[in-house]
């Protein structure tokens, strides 16, 4: 572990020290990353509503939207759905959903998406038909290239056995990735055992048919897509003319907000070595995915925290995560009204909690600080463009 950490830190330090200096302090690359977690997407929904509200107040603009402030918005599974909601344009070329619309969306559609009566005894728990229907209604024919800012939505192709990352910046090289947002959102949410895999086809630059056979993005990038989102931001900084002064991304000029959907309490549904000593394949299968996702999410946060701290840029990274979910709130598919109300409470209470044991700043205070940085950076860009 120590060797891995040292190598990772060394790589990022080399990147940072050899990268060009930003022309001005206000020129930052801003990234929003949203975890997967099914109905638990209500938790980041609460956080996003608070952040967007702060931006509207600071800029005295009720029409301000998150897509106006972030260069890259990435998500996996339910996080991919939220990414699409806040970046897909409406008829006025503004995001079709404000952050305040996210939680009502879950309350209205969650019980139908996670309706166990639609599943089969042998097969996925849910048939996915309502999910696909509502995605088509909300997102229409909109494709990746129309997103109002750069996006990074992951999925996994079970035929090619490779991850598939949908971004605007990849379209010049891979035009077949310019898929409908409805197809992408279903694919990134199609968790094995919960929803059927998704098949659809697009066209290559030669007009040939290109087929996708996709499942949940968490299979490709784990539940926390922060590292994926950062890599997309790095590529944009290298290729986008708007970032000509920062061809090599300096982490001191990267602003990263990563939103989780909650993890179990340390003592909730854990197991001892004695208890599991005689477990077989079936018993392990029931818990191994949860363990793997929790560990991967923790390590992603650990690596990012280490890098930002060692580069003296710890204030540029904020991970908002509830680590003490219990009972029904731990379930990704409990869309009962009672549980959704509990998830709202989790999100609202999270805002009042300290960021960490070593940092007494509350998440609410940290998000206000982030909002100020986002607002100032947007104003800087606007002023620069006017000259």
Swiss-Prot record:
Pfam families, per this entry? Patatin
Per the UniProt entry, what is one GO biological process? defense response
Q: Where is this motif: DGA/G?
A: 216-218
The cross-references to Gene3D superfamilies, in alphabetical order and at most eight, read: Cytosolic phospholipase A2 catalytic domain
**Start and end of every PNPLA domain?**
32-230
Q: Which GO terms describe its molecular function?
A: monoacylglycerol lipase activity; nutrient reservoir activity; phospholipase activity
Keyword Signal present in the record's keywords: the answer is yes
User: What's noted about domains in the record?
Assistant: The nitrogen atoms of the two glycine residues in the GGXR motif define the oxyanion hole, and stabilize the oxyanion that forms during the nucleophilic attack by the catalytic serine during substrate cleavage.
Summary of the function given for this chain in its UniProt record: Probable lipolytic acyl hydrolase (LAH), an activity which is thought to be involved in the response of tubers to pathogens.
**What PANTHER family does the database record attribute to this sequence?**
PATATIN GROUP D-2, XYLOSE ISOMERASE
**Family per similarity comment:** Belongs to the patatin family.
Q: Name the chain's protein.
A: Patatin-03
Give the organism the record lists. Solanum tuberosum (Potato)
Taxonomic lineage is: Eukaryota, Viridiplantae, Streptophyta, Embryophyta, Tracheophyta
């Amino acid at each position: 572990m120590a060797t891995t950490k040292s190598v990772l830190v060394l790589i990022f330090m080399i990147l940072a020290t050899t990268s060009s200096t930003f022309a001005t302090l206000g020129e930052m690359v801003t990234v929003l990353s949203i975890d997967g977690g099914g109905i638990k997407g209500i938790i980041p929904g609460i956080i996003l509503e608070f952040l967007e509200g702060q931006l509207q107040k600071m800029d005295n603009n009720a029409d301000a939207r998150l897509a106006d402030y972030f260069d890259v918005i990435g998500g996996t599974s339910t996080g991919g759905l939220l990414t699409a909601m806040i970046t897909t344009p409406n008829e006025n070329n503004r995001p079709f959903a404000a952050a305040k619309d996210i939680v009502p969306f879950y309350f209205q559609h969650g019980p139908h998406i996670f309706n166990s009566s639609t599943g089969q005894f042998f097969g996925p728990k849910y048939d996915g038909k309502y999910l696909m229907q509502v995605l088509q209604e909300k997102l229409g024919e909109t494709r990746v290239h129309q997103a109002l800012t750069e996006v990074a939505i992951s999925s996994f192709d079970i035929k090619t056995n490779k991850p598939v990352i949908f971004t605007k910046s990849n379209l010049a090289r891979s035009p077949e990735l310019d898929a409908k947002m409805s197809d992408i959102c279903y694919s990134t949410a199609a968790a094995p055992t919960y929803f059927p895999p998704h098949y659809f086809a697009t066209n290559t630059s030669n007009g040939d048919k290109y087929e996708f056979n996709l499942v949940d993005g968490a299979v490709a990038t784990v539940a926390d897509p922060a590292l994926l989102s950062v890599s997309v931001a790095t590529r944009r900084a290298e290729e986008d003319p708007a970032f000509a002064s920062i061809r090599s991304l300096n982490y001191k000029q990267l602003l990263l907000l990563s939103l989780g959907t909650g993890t179990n309490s340390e003592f909730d549904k854990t197991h001892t070595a004695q208890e599991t000593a005689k477990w077989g394949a079936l018993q392990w299968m029931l818990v191994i995915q949860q363990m793997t996702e929790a560990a991967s999410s923790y390590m992603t946060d650990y690596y990012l925290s280490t890098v930002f701290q060692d580069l003296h840029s710890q204030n540029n990274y904020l991970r908002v995560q509830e680590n003490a979910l219990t009972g029904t709130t731990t379930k990704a598919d409990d869309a009962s009204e009672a549980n959704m109300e509990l998830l709202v409470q989790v999100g609202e209470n999270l805002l009042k909690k300290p960021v960490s044991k070593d940092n007494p700043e509350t998440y609410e205070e940290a998000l206000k600080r982030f909002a100020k940085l986002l607002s100032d950076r947007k104003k800087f860009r606007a002023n620069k463009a006017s000259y």
